[in-house]
Amino acid sequence: MEEEEWSEEQQRFSYLQRLKAAVHYTVGCLCEEVASDKDMQFSKQTIAAISEVTFGQCENFAKDLEMFARHAKRSTINTEDVKLLARRSHSLLKYITEKNEDIAQLNLEKKAKKKKKLEDENRNSVESAEAGVEESEN
């Protein structure tokens, strides 16, 4: 039993390290992009510090999102939780709200297309069935 727990702990640690490495890589890429745009340099220590702060903030966001969902007696985080998290940044909240509305609109359009297609298929199958009945009567 202890070996299983140790193995799970090792897997979690490995996963966490990979996540941190991915964040560090992404921060490094963003810093390079900003550096080339602004004609400046970022030290490795600065990139590492930004990466650590970013990772820590993401952990806090994840915990907050879990708490918001749990408070609403849900086990799934939804867009309302994300909006609540972003409430202090008006520009971010506006962006998230707009994207959410865009996605909702796309979903409505897809649903309408699917419904129309289904109705057309049903109409066609009824018409072909009626045509088959007429032929058999003749």
From Swiss-Prot:
Principal subcellular localisation of the protein: nucleus
N-acetylmethionine sites (modified residues): 1
Gene Ontology MF terms: chromatin binding; DNA binding; protein heterodimerization activity
Stretches for region Disordered: 112-138
Keyword annotations of the record: Acetylation, Cell cycle, Cell division, Centromere, Chromosome, DNA damage, DNA repair, DNA-binding, Kinetochore, Mitosis, Nucleus
InterPro entries named among the record's database cross-references: CENP-S/Mhf1, Histone-fold
Compartments, as annotated in UniProt: Nucleus; Chromosome, Centromere; Chromosome, Centromere, Kinetochore
GO cellular component: FANCM-MHF complex; Fanconi anaemia nuclear complex; kinetochore
PANTHER family: CENTROMERE PROTEIN S, CORTISTATIN
Summary of the function given for this chain in its UniProt record: DNA-binding component of the Fanconi anemia (FA) core complex. Required for the normal activation of the FA pathway, leading to monoubiquitination of the FANCI-FANCD2 complex in response to DNA damage, cellular resistance to DNA cross-linking drugs, and prevention of chromosomal breakage. In complex with CENPX (MHF heterodimer), crucial cofactor for FANCM in both binding and ATP-dependent remodeling of DNA. Stabilizes FANCM. In complex with CENPX and FANCM (but not other FANC proteins), rapidly recruited to blocked forks and promotes gene conversion at blocked replication forks.
Family of this protein: Belongs to the TAF9 family. CENP-S/MHF1 subfamily.
Name of the protein in question: Centromere protein S
Organism the protein comes from: Bos taurus
Gene name per UniProt: CENPS
